[in-house]
Amino acid sequence: MTDTAQPRPRTRLYLITPPQIGDVSAFRKSLEETLSAGDVASLQLRLKGQDGMIDMQATQEVGAAVTAMAQEAGVAVLINDAAELSRQLGADGVHLGWDDMPVKTARALLGPDAIIGATAKNSYHRAMQAGEDGADYVAFGAFYPTTTKEGTIPAELELLEVWQSAMILPCVAIGGITVSNAAPLVTAGADFLAVSSGVWNHEDGPAAAVRAFNALFESLA
């Protein structure tokens, strides 16, 4: 019998903005250079205030500056936690956190073509429910300690392995991911790696980080 199973597409990079951006113009220039350095599937705007809550004003300002540019580069733009703002900015969709609006509510607001992702932390059940409700992907993590988000819950590689073996819905790995620790997540089955500081704080700069991640993905494909 011939094995007709198709190989899994190689892992792709899911870029997340820094939590605070001081100079929007400078960030736009840096982002443009970063996106031109290699394949980036999506960009999530996740801007937080000092209280840890989403900074709507900053998200609006940054979104207005970079959404069209990123989309022209073939990168899907997602807004963290704010479906209505995503619609206003003309973004491609929204990422919903653990305590955010239900997937079905976001779908009703944004329509059938929007990309809607949902945080599942370390819960297989929560991920399955999000898929049943119409999410386009689920995000598991944190797989490593992270400085960009407080109150994270550890997730194990086995979660990615089990999900990939049983489900079609894409999964994203998140939490403290760098070029040096990413390989086990790719091997375990992550379709996307969501990275923030591992790109923006890379010792050789964000563009070099994008090149390094893509080289890693190719080597493990």
Curated annotation (Swiss-Prot):
SUPFAM superfamilies: Thiamin phosphate synthase. The keyword RNA-binding does not apply. Keywords: Magnesium, Metal-binding, Thiamine biosynthesis, Transferase. Pathway: Cofactor biosynthesis; thiamine diphosphate biosynthesis; thiamine phosphate from 4-amino-2-methyl-5-diphosphomethylpyrimidine and 4-methyl-5-(2-phosphoethyl)-thiazole: step 1/1. 4-amino-2-methyl-5-(diphosphooxymethyl)pyrimidine binds at residues 44-48, 80, 119, 149. 2-[(2R,5Z)-2-carboxy-4-methylthiazol-5(2H)-ylidene]ethyl phosphate binds at residues 146-148, 176. Its EC number is 2.5.1.3. Pfam families: TMP-TENI. Mg(2+) binds at residues 81, 100. The keyword Cytoplasm does not apply. Belongs to the thiamine-phosphate synthase family. NCBIfam families: thiE. HAMAP family: TMP_synthase (MF_00097). Condenses 4-methyl-5-(beta-hydroxyethyl)thiazole monophosphate (THZ-P) and 2-methyl-4-amino-5-hydroxymethyl pyrimidine pyrophosphate (HMP-PP) to form thiamine monophosphate (TMP). This is Thiamine-phosphate synthase. It comes from Hyphomonas neptunium (strain ATCC 15444).
